[in-house]
């Protein structure tokens, strides 16, 4: 869940006192912090999560707006959607389920308004549908949202959860009283508190999946949590932006050695159905499956699109995630534009993900040999999204659209060949110029003519024949050029052609699809086949008049903590700087960046910059504004003591404006930075 304590004074006595792990630590809370009877009882055997858990978590869609009806309706939806039959089991509550105080005996209790029948009844409802109930707590004095924490009540809370029939316990890392642990580093405190919680859960005698949500990667939970838990967070909370998905994926790249049956790296809840489009959701789901990550859906299961349901219930992809070997994927190659990830499966197959990180269609390739497969005359390449198998001589390649992934299951063919069609690839490369020199953004304009190159390649063991390649586009787009043909395309060779594509003069903003289609024959001409791929051309139109940035769609946005928020602060109220509230603006937490397309139409930007008043005098950031990659404003270090910066910068002729928020060199805690009333002055048409 998102932790307000990262930005407010909810964490009391937070002391940065080192990060070295002491190998031998006491396994219970200090007596001074533990009421009588709170020593964890002798532990029984630990529950084992042989494969990563699958289920649902409410936080990223509902936050604190949770209740009994939501949980029960979600359980019903998990059944009716086919998710239960696909392997999803856990229905997990996050923060805000509890009453604001414990009962007279010091026990946790569910909020009587949100859960009028109590948590035991909710658990019974979930169990009756063949599902399991998960719940949330915190090792600190309060949860991240300010509800009663487990500090000093660990065994009692574990017993309470067991008595309710809880099956999964997620324990967060907020409001930790570090002052009660003199001489210990934060990492040592984490090990101490979470070990005590692990013992308490085991001592109940009820198998409960233990999820550690110690969200500070500086404490390296992957080095100590495997011994005491079933999964552990490897990063901070994130949002549904593509860049944040990539950041969490990158965090996992060096951590494969720490995961395995019974203990899993947790890159956070799934954002499937919340991403910018279905392709991003499929790529995200592919990546989490490759990571052997917990598959905890974070969308509203009661109201999801057919595409979202199809993504979440793709059994071939789920089988990769749930592979019994439990070996997390490793990254074979990495650039800013593309990744290749490899995962070894229990039967010796390799799962291969070709991930396009960038904003344009890219050909990505590897080989069966590079994936670690034994030498063979041919390989079966199973596309886990298209549900089709092809035969390859060894190349594993695809033309992957922007923000997308191709996911394959690859195995050697025992007899060197099979009855599969040859693996082929079609690529389309519209050569759209950058928005400005050196930019990664490629934008087409109305009336512009774009040279587009398309190709068709044969990666199979034998040649294909009677090949023809053509390019088509949207209605109203002019395409000059004829289909290209060849009597045969041998293995490892390509057929290519060039077309001139003209964007209509009256086109509106959006992403437009160019399709390359190849027809051919295989199997000594006995079988006809078609292969195609799509590439998008992005058309943007700059703003007009005097809009606020917060009323426009950004090109990209990254944030150090959760998503960039529009016209509100983290806590839902207005942006506020030094007592002045603002109706319009952007809330960020360092390190953050936001880009907007201007198209050369705007002449100036005005804004008020400063730390949000919610951080109560803490935090420090820097602001930097650039136009087409050229710096036009630098704030220097900004603290709560710095007067509000009233910015007025020129933008004449700029295609793109970018605002960066830095951490001023002292970390990102409390770095809630507002970009208030950010207003453009642009041409009227």
Which residues does each PLM region occupy?
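Aromatic-lined carbohydrate-binding/catalytic grooves of carbohydrate-active enzymes
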Residues: 74, 78-184
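Carbohydrate-binding surface patches
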Residues: 288-291, 296-298, 334-373
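Short beta-strand elements of extracellular/lumenal beta-sandwich folds
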Residues: 348-354, 446-462
